[in-house]
Regions:
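Short, Lys/Arg-enriched anionic-surface-contact patches
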Residues: 128-137, 171, 177-186
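N-terminal regulatory/effector-sensing and dimerization cores
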Residues: 1-87
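Short hydrophobic/aromatic patch on the recognition helix
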Residues: 47, 169, 173, 217-218, ...
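Basic, amphipathic alpha-helical hairpins
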Residues: 101-105, 119-126, 140-157, 173, ...
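Terminal helix-turn-helix DNA-binding modules in bacterial transcription factors
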Residues: 152, 156, 175-219, 235-243
């Protein structure tokens, strides 16, 4: 059994914790969605396919407007998909199959569903994808911040260097990444912190190297994005985002 739903949500969209009897596949066309589950938070960027298994408790929110579609699968159809929330990076064929199924108004082609599930079973899974803006001036800012994650320049300073007003900088940055500048920089730091934690760097050194004035401030931001403290993250057997 398959049903579909169009996803159209304004900025500031948020759901309470809930679950579905059906498995849920969804693709975000525009915007950026954050999924909270028992396993932590995952950033779901546009052009990816997300997955929530039947009965899995989760909540969702987004700062930006969301456009996309969802496909709900009977639990009997979900055996080849992960039993935990996942994010897939689909190829063109998978995108096309998803689109065909999502616009089926009454009946769907079971062959297309089987092929979609086959493709997702081997599709690469990603987590914590950091969107990159398309504007070359914003790209320069992003490259700098990825290289120097301890940079604490204000948004006014970055806007001035990019040759934009603060208002234009913020508007374009949000439009092209689905995030505001402050949250984007936080996520960039969290992702870098994950790499350093995996390399065995101490939390205090990481906090300073990420531009935080105190370890407690770093821990608070890290926990907000991952649901774990840096110490808890470091002892996990499987790094988040490689499941």
């Amino acid at each position: 059994m398959v049903s579909t739903e169009t996803l159209l949500h304004p900025g500031g969209y948020r759901t309470p914790w809930h679950s579905h009897r059906a498995g849920q596949l969804w693709r975000i066309a525009t915007g950026l969605l954050v999924i909270e589950s028992q396993r932590g938070r995952s950033v779901v960027p546009a052009k990816h396919i997300g997955w929530i298994p039947p009965g899995n408790q989760h909540a969702a929110f987004s700062e930006s407007a969301i456009e996309g579609c969802a496909i709900y699968l009977d639990p009997a159809c979900c055996t080849r998909l992960p039993d935990v929330p996942a994010l897939f990076e689909p190829d063109d064929l998978t995108h096309a199959l998803f689109s065909r199924l999502s616009v089926a108004e009454s009946e769907y082609d079971p062959r297309k569903l089987t092929l979609l599930l086959d493709e997702l079973a081997v599709a690469p899974q990603v987590h914590f994808t950091l969107p990159v803006p398309t504007d070359p001036r914003l790209k320069d800012v992003v490259r700098h911040l990825l290289q120097f994650v301890d940079d604490n320049q204000t948004v006014e300073s970055h806007a001035r260097q990019a040759g934009m007003s603060v208002r234009t900088f913020n508007r374009r940055f949000r439009a092209q990444t689905g995030m505001n500048f402050v949250n984007w920089r936080q996520l960039a730091r969290v992702m870098q912190a994950m790499e350093w934690l995996a390399a065995g760097k101490p939390v205090g050194w990481i906090a300073l190297s990420c531009g935080y004035s105190s370890v407690s401030a770093f821990i608070e931001v890290f926990r907000a994005w991952t649901g774990k403290t840096p110490g808890q993250w470091a002892v996990k057997e499987v790094p988040f985002g490689r499941r």
